[in-house]
Amino acid sequence: VDAETSITIAGERDDYVSRGGHKLAGALDAFPSIVVEGRRALDAGASTGGFTDVLLKRNVGNVVAVDVGYGQMAWEIRNDPRVSVLDRTNVRHLTIEQIGDPVDLVVADLSFISLSLVLPALVSVTKTTADFLVMVKPQFEVGREKLGAGGVVRDPALRKSAVIEVAESAYDVGLGTLGITASPLPGPAGNVERHIRRSAGTPF
């Protein structure tokens, strides 16, 4: 190849530090009434920081990024002064003492645990006016015995029941459901994922 030749590598262009960013961006676009700018947010299951990246690009006030793992978050996200990272932290046992002031926006992308198990902890660290935008991954909601090949939930009825069960669990902790939207991207194995928007004091 000539030294003056420009080379373009074909592939998926990614505006965020992980593909998860596109999932949250799509959900926020589907619910334009959710205000991000200036708010204090919690990113549950932050991992490499895709969701946090979206919030930062939409001018969030600050983000508490929580993950049970360690050292996964992209360097440029971790070093943003608006981000507080809580590594090695199980969100199921999260307390207000760990994060300081309560948050008024919660986003979540959790794996290997049902959302129903973590919602009580999430509610305990939020303001009563908080918005919740959480991703339902059916493969972690329906039970291992109902998974198809490759860990994919192929039955639409099972995917629907996963969303309903999470919505009912949310109602039990005082959260109503305001809307449901499909993720613009499937999970890595092909699972159909959905975002549920919830808010305190909203009818089921």
What residues fall within each predicted segment?
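S4-like RNA-binding module at protein N-termini
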Residues: 1-30
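Short, glycine-/aromatic-enriched active-site segment of Class I SAM-dependent methyltransferases
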Residues: 138-155
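Core SAM-dependent methyltransferase catalytic element
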Residues: 185-204
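S-adenosyl-L-methionine
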Residues: 64-117
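Conserved S-adenosyl-L-methionine
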Residues: 39, 54-62
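Conserved class I S-adenosyl-L-methionine
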Residues: 36-47
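A short glycine-rich, Lys/Arg-flanked "PGG" loop and its adjoining helix->strand segment in the class I
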Residues: 116-133
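Glycine-rich SAM-binding Motif I of class I
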Residues: 49-50, 71
